[in-house]
């Protein structure tokens, strides 16, 4: 386990029967770019059982956060969903990934398209000051089946718009677009269908995507 660190769980939040988030301590030596993922897991029978998880917390925070689905027969998630405050979580020493700002060409609009727990890397990027310096508009689209699957909705609708640091940037530049497929909601439909029909762009008041202005 030389490539792993042991962190301590400080908070567990169950959004509903299918989704949960974990916060842990963060080793002072851990460095990562917002949007990267780490291998995390548990020691099972003396051996590490690991899976890749995007780091949901921004890189300036003193803790780590991960967002997960509950899979009852999943080798790791069947165990991870029962984790408690004070338990240990294994975290790889060197996060990696390509869903980072360094890999994007300059543009006007940044589209962050996600479904389910694919939201995780964008939770970090949405709180990255450099994102707001580089783009005129940041559009986060989060597609789920039911409204109660919209984890972190309150953060986007209430907390960040009123944040002392990000509030002004967020209100001016950020567009949060949640959409639901299985029940009535203000935005309904699959992300891909909303883009193909043009409804997404009509709703947010921006022109359809083009290669000169838009980055995904």
Language-model features, listed with the residues they occupy:
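Reductase modules of NAD(P)H-dependent flavoproteins
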Residues: 2-3, 141, 148-216
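Ferredoxin-reductase
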Residues: 2-85
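Generic structural signal for buried aliphatic residues
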Residues: 38, 89-92
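Short, Lys/Arg- and Gly-enriched loop/turn segments at beta-strand edges
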Residues: 46-53, 96-104
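A structural signal for isolated positions on well-ordered beta-strands in alpha/beta enzyme cores
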Residues: 65, 90, 111, 139-141, ...
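Short helix-loop-beta connector
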Residues: 104-109, 212-213
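Ser/Thr-glycine-rich phosphate-binding loops at phosphate-binding pockets of nucleotides
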Residues: 115-120
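Histidine-anchored nucleotide/phosphate-binding helix
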Residues: 121-133
């Amino acid at each position: 386990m030389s490539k792993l660190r042991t962190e301590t769980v400080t908070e567990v939040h169950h959004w509903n029967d299918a989704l949960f988030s974990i916060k842990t301590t963060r080793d002072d030596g851990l460095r990562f770019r917002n949007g990267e993922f780490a291998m995390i897991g548990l020691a099972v029978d003396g051996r590490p059982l690991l899976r890749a998880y995007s780091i949901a917390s921004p890189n300036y925070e003193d803790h780590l956060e991960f967002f997960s689905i509950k899979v009852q027969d999943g080798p790791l998630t069947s165990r991870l969903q029962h984790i408690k405050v004070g338990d240990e979580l294994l975290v790889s020493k060197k996060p990696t990934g390509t869903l980072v700002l360094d890999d994007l060409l300059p543009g006007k609009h940044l589209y962050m398209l996600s479904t389910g727990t694919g939201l995780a890397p964008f939770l970090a990027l949405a709180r990255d000051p450099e994102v707001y310096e580089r783009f005129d508009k940041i559009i986060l689209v989060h597609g789920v089946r039911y409204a109660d699957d919209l984890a972190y909705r309150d953060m986007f609708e209430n907390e960040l718009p009123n944040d002392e640091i990000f509030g002004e940037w967020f209100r001016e530049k950020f567009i949060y677009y949640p959409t639901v497929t299985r029940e009535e909601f203000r935005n309904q439909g699959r992300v891909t269908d909303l883009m193909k029909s043009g409804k997404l762009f009509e709703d947010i008041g921006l022109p359809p995507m083009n290669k000169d202005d838009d980055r995904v």
